[in-house]
Structures are given as C-alpha cells and as structure tokens.
Amino acid sequence: MATKKNNFEEQLNELQEIVNKLESGNVPLEDALNEFQAGVKLSRELEKKLNDAEQTVAKLVDKDGNEKTLDPQNASAPEEE
C-alpha cells in the first residue's frame, strides 16, 4: 500500500512497483483494487508536483528561454521587463 512520501523519485518508484505488480496478474482482486487506488493517488500527487514545478519554471523563464530577474523585495514574483 502507498505511503505518504515527499520525494518525487521515491513516489515514482513506488508507482512503478504498483504497476509492475498489477501487470504480473498474480494479485488477488481485492489486493489489486487496493493497489490500483494507491496508484491513482500517487499518480495524482506526482502530477501535482510536476505541474507545480512547471509553474515555478514558467515564473523564472520567459517565453524565449531567458531567465527573468526576480524583484528582491518580492522573490515569489518576477519583475516585469
């Protein structure tokens, strides 16, 4: 069963283990359903982390791939150029 982990790579490895287990076909139905639910939950968590990372990169890089300058007084928002 999936456990709460903060590390993206660990969660991705756990999801891969679940997929491998389910693909083997040697899992009782009830266990397969539990594993599937855990996999869906992990998949959603990973997707959220990827979306968050993508948004962070978008804030730091303009459409041409150049780094944006951050306003030191408001480090979370890039300066307008």
From Swiss-Prot:
Q: Which UniProt keywords apply?
A: Cytoplasm, Exonuclease, Hydrolase, Nuclease
Location(s), subcellular: Cytoplasm
- UniProt-recorded Gene Ontology molecular function terms: exodeoxyribonuclease VII activity
Q: Which GO terms describe its biological process?
A: DNA catabolic process
Q: Which reaction does it catalyse?
A: Exonucleolytic cleavage in either 5'- to 3'- or 3'- to 5'-direction to yield nucleoside 5'-phosphates
Report biased composition (Polar residues) as residue ranges: 71-81
Q: Where is this region: Disordered?
A: 59-81
Report the EC number(s), separated by commas if there are several: 3.1.11.6
Q: How does it assemble?
A: Heterooligomer composed of large and small subunits.
So what does this one do?
A: Bidirectionally degrades single-stranded DNA into large acid-insoluble oligonucleotides, which are then degraded further into small acid-soluble oligonucleotides.
Q: Which family does it belong to?
A: Belongs to the XseB family.
- Protein name as annotated: Exodeoxyribonuclease 7 small subunit
User: Which organism is this protein's natural source?
Assistant: Lactobacillus gasseri (strain ATCC 33323 / DSM 20243 / BCRC 14619 / CIP 102991 / JCM 1131 / KCTC 3163 / NCIMB 11718 / NCTC 13722 / AM63)
